Amino acid sequence: MLQEDGLSPNARIANKVGVSEETVRRRVKRMLKDDYLRVVAVPNTEKMGFSSQVLIGLQVIPEKMDIVAEQLSNIPEVRWLSVTTGSFDIFAWVILKDSKDLGVFLRETVFCVEGIQKVETFLNLDLKTRNLDMVM
């Protein structure tokens, strides 16, 4: 239920799952404290004027992997970053205002990071799903 509505009242959850409101409150509090659960707001980036969403694949010099990943993960426009297997060593999902900003971002930010050998961009043309739920 919290995946659908992170602000769902404890009373509604308790009623739906058949336990007391205090039980729900205690369990949610424990899951938050133990980092099993985090309640966040997910912005609609397009409505906020950020129309350019880009997946960036990077090939990196192996001995620079951790440094490059750390540097890129500290850039505000990078929404998620993952070290991977396959043709690319790192994938970064970047959200920008427009394609002009993408060019500036690549030239002034990504290309300046030492250790990156190859960069390939995959511009999002049409987002079909944006599901942050976890299958349980």
Stretches with model-predicted labels:
Residues 1-136:
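A compositional/biophysical signature of low hydrophobicity enriched in polar/charged and small residues
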